[in-house]
Structure formats: C-alpha cells, structure tokens
Amino acid sequence: MRITSTAFEPEGDIPSRYTCDGEDISPPLAIEDLPPETVSLVLVMDDPDAPMGTWDHWLAYDIEPRTQIPEAVEGLGTPGTNSWERTGYGGPCPP
C-alpha cells in the first residue's frame, strides 16, 4: 500500500494552506495498491520530530476502503483525538 498527495512533492514541504499558517485543512490523499481483502483503514498522521515528542495531527479508524481521500474531508471514519485534544485534522504549526 502506498499513500501520496498531489498537494506536495515527496519529502517536500507541506504547503501553508494545510498548516496553521493557512486554512489548516487536510490535504488530498491517494491510496494505491490497497489489498482487495481490505475491510477498513486506519489513518495516523504524526510528527515524530516535534520538540515536545511525537505530535499526532490526524487520527481516524474504521475508514471505508477507498483510493482517494478528498481535501478538507469531514467525517472520515471514526475520528481519534489528536495532540490538540480535538478530533479531525490539525496541520503542522511549528513554534
């Protein structure tokens, strides 16, 4: 399985639109090579190099298998609580 985004290049910077300096919306994601027997997906977007330790930006589970997750998606599976102690996406916001 491979996850990519058309919003930025691999190993590139995340555009400000998807950070606290911009609209702070989730980027579009494409999922490739999803095994046919997949029942559900889990999404974890974290920053292991954050100054205060690993920072969870986006957590969701029980996501219906799909090949595209649209930009600014709402209601994606069952949301988990991120490091801001809220559900949904919270983009990078370096100090």
Regions from the language model: what does each represent?
Residues 1-95:
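N-terminus-centered regions that define maturation/targeting leaders and the start
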